């Protein structure tokens, strides 16, 4: 039988099988499982049939609960159906899983296992989610590798048909779902050989049909429910043996044999680890290493977790075992032990006697000691060093039980110590690491490299990619291994023989060379040439190069990319350098393979994109140069080396928590933090992003004072609040740095004052949106404006000083600003700054504006999504506070309940204000009727009103302190009032999130909240896709757009959420687009917050998922409005009370066609290449629908 190999990740490995074996696939995106649904949707779009020759129906639902419901319905009517999920998504499915499992329905749900949100959200892998489903009645089959995930997907589908027990097939999120490995693919005949078609016919025979009507899903009473529930026992009792039989048959077919409980190790092992998931591979590798050196250890891999087979499990254990460590990748606080540990203890307690075939344990085989431990939560590293520490613990006379490994628990002292230098990796494996920016294509190029080596040679290949949670512009670290033997190393590289650093700034922030092995090759993308780079390298980097005798090569990849017309995409260039230096393939062969990959990868994007990439390849090697290392300098800086080792990366002005805790996380040393340093409830300070100084921009904006008209549009659109304006008295310039710029203020309200626009050089991302929107042009040089981009590196030091000086200039009094004028409103201090959002992000300008206007009194409920990640992901937070210590209070609950969560804020704030008012009235004699009346009747509509109310509350507190408190009841009332008094100052509740949240998963919640009539403000940042999970379609996605889950183009019209909200009549509704009409956006925010009732602002937000140049995102917003694809309007119920039409259209009739604006975005253009006839048809429909919608709104606004 011929073997077919492919280099794929776990998600694709599973999806390939699941797609072949199902007819209806209901999907919903959630990291890290989304790619399984994306593959299924893409294959459906290309018309790929399943095993029986029909193309499955792949349907996106509004939530994971919806997907489970759809699958349940499909199963009940006889289809083969599946879904994919993880984490909170699995929790939403659990009610349906109980039903599906209880009805003995054949189906498989595939889970990329992930942490559940507890004290914090985490998108990374562990078994928290699947363990929450272990009582559903689903069998649970666990894969440990990419190959196993491919194989077990088939075994699970075969087993569910043969057993009628529903199956949950899970594998570790990221470590398996995203790890790229060379795997042997299952042929259709392999798949067909395991599927019993008679069982499929039986499944269909059980379907609900009016041709043979049945009733299922009854309500039962106490007299029979218990008995009926026990009736399923025979199915579960038979299940393990059936699964093992299928595994045996699979082995005969493929040569890959599996056991439901599989032992590997010494036949006479005295110590044993029991484990599930990708950790099995690491333990397997370590067991082989230790046994080769005289140890007697083993590993038992648990494949079938449910139903548990006591007899088979105990028989799999070696008779010689004396001590067992059970490792769980989850934490269940308050339990007697984690799930796998408890099952093992129970199984051995019940089964060990039978193992020895005697009524009591024999002397030769005493019951082993069993201890449990936790490892790997939220993808925490699990290395051979940690495995060895577990075995060493087992060797102790009294081993530590309920231990943790991989952390330093200095609070409850559960952790085991381990030697991080212990390694099991063979020397003949190529280990390469690449440090890249999230937007530079490094990860994509490395995936191509793996395919080139894995599929073009006999070598095995492994790729794993580590991301920080910043968006585009984040740091990515790619870990690639190549070798002649299968690679089991499911952990990060710590001894690399090749390191590529693709961004110069990383050398200043991160210990890039710590993982370099002695004599390794270093490739550096450098703005300095080979002759000058040495003197510009940070001292610590030079010391490491000398100490480890590293070889250094440099290339100015950014310059090569610019010369080739590729902008900031340096991936192909650095890939060529890697193959030239690493010697994995002959250079000529490697370059030929790279060019083939370019044509395949970028062919859909057009001939020009392919040409530019090919040109970059041809120009690369002539620009690659080796650096001569001055060996004579070794030992020159011994004193400096000692100094550097004790130096904090942050200034002493940073708070201690920032320096000692967040600072470690910022430089990727968070693994070293002990338990005691971290808040146990997940509460963190705000205002910490200002300390990060990422320095990711190659170019920053420079202000031209002679051209500027002081409109502040550049300030308003800046996604990262990195460019700001101030007016101030000339006397403030007395100690200004010599390069600090200022001009006379042009606004007559600031006569005789100075005006400055200043950029934060180390916080700017270089998106250039400020330049794009600047209306002021240099008449003598039309290509220049009042803001122009220039290289950051030469400007960094002087602009850092200028920024520090600028921050110390006084902010204008908020009470004196005309907030309806952008040039004055943008003088307000933003309380959202330097987020991890993409360069050029379309969402963050709205969030920033919100905080400028209302941040000092706002409480934010943030739906999970892009905004919760760039707004609330460690290490730093962009939400900040003003000099008075006031600022937005922020929290994230879940994706599916954010509207209700924020509604809870409002209920609480109103109740506390009500209680405070009740108490206040009881003290009118003590504090004075005038003060009480002025507080209770304060209008609180303007900045001045808010300021005055705060003064009254301060006076109230002072008066309360003067009241004698001999009476305990009186003292309690005073304490209560003092604790609640601040709630008598108006608080602004904002419920924010993206369109996936608002249009889909929590639409019901939003509907309920706005129907309540309560005073909440909802901001929907509409990117028209699920941006956070990678750009999947939502009900906000417009017709004809290609998105993940809509690979054939979205056939349905965009949901008109604003119209739905207007139907209530008592809701303020606005549709805005900052790039189209900034003053209308400002009006909408002011009116929404002022409206005493529910308000919703739907804000168009351009996104990288649209396939646009983000620099021109604001232009795209304008084009959208001019074509009528996006409407600008405000619906204000207060106007109705004045006898006016509440709906105001804030735009003219469309002046360009839908086609003109659509085809500026790749998400629409893609369809014209892949399905031109479909694209033409959908375009015509889209134009007709835009025209009809415009006419309807015109009619409604003119009544």
UniProtKB/Swiss-Prot annotation:
Swiss-Prot/TrEMBL GO biological process terms: electron transport chain; nitrogen fixation; response to oxidative stress
Keywords: 4Fe-4S, Electron transport, Iron, Iron-sulfur, Metal-binding, Nitrogen fixation, Oxidoreductase, Repeat, Transport
UniProt binding sites for [4Fe-4S] cluster 2: 718, 764, 767, 770
SUPFAM superfamilies according to UniProt: 4Fe-4S ferredoxins, Pyruvate-ferredoxin oxidoreductase, PFOR, domain III, Thiamin diphosphate-binding fold (THDP-binding), TK C-terminal domain-like
Residue ranges of domain 4Fe-4S ferredoxin-type in the record: 699-728, 755-784
Binding site for [4Fe-4S] cluster 1: 708, 711, 714, 774
Gene Ontology MF terms: 4 iron, 4 sulfur cluster binding; iron ion binding; pyruvate-flavodoxin oxidoreductase activity; thiamine pyrophosphate binding
InterPro entries according to UniProt: 4Fe4S_Fe-S-bd, 4Fe4S_Fe_S_CS, PFOR_II, Pyruvate:ferred/Flavod_OxRd, Pyrv-flavodox_OxR_EKR_sf, Pyrv-flavodox_OxRtase_EKR, Pyrv/ketoisovalerate_OxRed_cat, Pyrv_Fd/Flavodoxin_OxRdtase_N
Keyword Iron assigned: yes
SMART domains assigned: EKR
UniProt entry tagged with the keyword Metal-binding: yes
Cofactor note: Binds 3 [4Fe-4S] clusters per subunit.
Pfam entry (one): Fer4_7
EC annotation from Swiss-Prot or TrEMBL: 1.2.7.-
Reaction(s) the record says it catalyses: oxidized [flavodoxin] + pyruvate + CoA + 2 H(+) = reduced [flavodoxin] + acetyl-CoA + CO2
Sequence similarity: Belongs to the pyruvate:ferredoxin/flavodoxin oxidoreductase family.
NCBIfam families: pyruv_ox_red
Functional note: Oxidoreductase required for the transfer of electrons from pyruvate to flavodoxin, which reduces nitrogenase.
Protein name listed in UniProt: Pyruvate-flavodoxin oxidoreductase
Gene: nifJ
